[in-house]
Amino acid sequence: MAGTTGERPFSDILTSIRYWIIHSITVPSLFIAGWLFVSTGLAYDVFGSPRPNEYFSNGQQEAPIVLDRFGKL
């Protein structure tokens, strides 16, 4: 029972002016929105990750060294 699904062929979609008008606006908008999301620092606030200058406190400016991994906490 072969047949068609009634959908438009992909080649018709790609050659359509309407497709390119819509996507020439939405695709760059997504990149700009993503860039603003990261560059403004909103991504740090939304996901709760520390900003680059907040990884270590003022008293500790380097990564901690684990000396007793299996010891009691």
From Swiss-Prot:
Keywords: Chloroplast, Electron transport, Heme, Iron, Membrane, Metal-binding, Photosynthesis, Photosystem II, Plastid, Thylakoid, Transmembrane, Transmembrane helix, Transport. Pfam families: Cytochrom_B559 (PF00283), Cytochrom_B559a (PF00284). The gene is psbE. Belongs to the PsbE/PsbF family. It comes from Bigelowiella natans. This is Cytochrome b559 subunit alpha. PANTHER family: CYTOCHROME B559 SUBUNIT BETA-RELATED (PTHR33391:SF9). Its main location: plastid. SUPFAM superfamilies: Cytochrome b559 subunits. One of its GO terms (biological process) is photosynthetic electron transport chain. Heterodimer of an alpha subunit and a beta subunit. PSII is composed of 1 copy each of membrane proteins PsbA, PsbB, PsbC, PsbD, PsbE, PsbF, PsbH, PsbI, PsbJ, PsbK, PsbL, PsbM, PsbT, PsbY, PsbZ, Psb30/Ycf12, at least 3 peripheral proteins of the oxygen-evolving complex and a large number of cofactors. It forms dimeric complexes. It comes from the Eukaryota. GO terms for cellular component: chloroplast thylakoid membrane; photosystem II reaction center. It is found in: Plastid, Chloroplast thylakoid membrane. It is a single-pass membrane protein. GO terms for molecular function: electron transfer activity; heme binding; iron ion binding. Its cofactor is heme b. Heme binds at H23.
